[in-house]
C-alpha cells in the first residue's frame, strides 16, 4: 500500500510573525520560518526534503539588516515596488514578481524604499540554515540564528 499523503496548506496571512530589530540599525522586520521546529512561531509542519523556507515583511523605510546564510537562498518578492538589495558588493532594486539568488555566506540585506509593505518568500537549499547578523537580533538576543 502506498504512503498516504495529506494536504498541509499554510496561508501566509495566517502566519504568526515575529518582530525582529537591531539596536544599531534600521532593521525592523516581521519574520517566520514556518517549517522550522527551532523557530519560536513554527507551524508544526516539518519538511522532508533538503530545504528550508522563510517569509518576511518590511514596512516602508525599514530593512532586514546585513547578514549571511549558510546555504544558497532564492528570494521571491511577493509585494513591493522599490526594494533595495545588496548582495556582497552588488546593489540593485527588486519589486513584486521578481526573484534574486543569494550565494551561500555572502553578506546581503534588503531595505524597503517603496510606499507599501514589501513581502518575501525565501527558499534555502539546505534543511538547516545558519544565519549570522552583524549584531544581536531582538527579541531573540542573539546574532547567530539556526533554523
Question: Language model features by range: what are they?
Answer:
Residues 68, 72-96:
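A short beta-strand-loop-beta hairpin characteristic of the jelly-roll/cupin
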Residues 8, 111-147:
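Double-stranded beta-helix
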Residues 56, 75, 100:
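Conserved GNAT-family N-acetyltransferase fold
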Residues 43-48, 63-69, 86, 93, ...:
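Short histidine-centered beta-strand/loop micro-motifs
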Residues 36-41, 52-69:
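Conserved short histidine dyad/triad with adjacent acidic residue
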Residues 59, 87, 94-113, 123-125:
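Conserved metal-binding segment of the jelly-roll/cupin
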Residues 1-50, 135-147:
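A short, N-terminal "cap"/entry segment at the start of jelly-roll beta-barrel domains
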Amino acid at each position: 500500500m502506498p504512503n498516504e499523503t495529506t494536504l498541509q496548506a499554510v496561508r501566509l496571512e495566517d502566519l504568526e510573525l515575529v518582530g525582529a530589530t537591531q539596536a544599531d540599525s534600521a532593521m525592523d522586520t516581521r519574520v517566520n520560518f514556518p517549517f522550522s521546529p527551532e523557530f519560536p512561531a513554527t507551524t508544526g509542519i516539518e519538511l522532508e526534503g533538503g530545504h528550508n523556507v522563510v517569509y518576511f515583511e518590511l514596512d516602508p523605510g525599514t530593512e532586514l539588516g546585513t547578514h549571511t546564510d549558510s546555504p544558497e537562498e532564492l528570494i521571491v518578492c511577493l509585494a513591493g515596488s522599490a526594494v533595495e538589495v545588496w548582495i556582497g558588493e552588488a546593489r540593485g532594486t527588486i519589486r513584486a514578481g521578481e526573484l534574486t539568488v543569494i550565494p551561500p555566506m555572502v553578506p546581503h540585506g534588503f531595505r524597503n524604499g517603496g510606499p507599501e509593505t514589501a513581502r518575501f518568500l525565501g527558499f534555502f537549499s539546505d534543511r538547516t540554515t545558519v544565519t549570522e547578523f552583524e549584531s544581536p537580533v531582538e527579541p531573540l538576543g542573539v546574532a547567530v540564528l539556526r533554523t
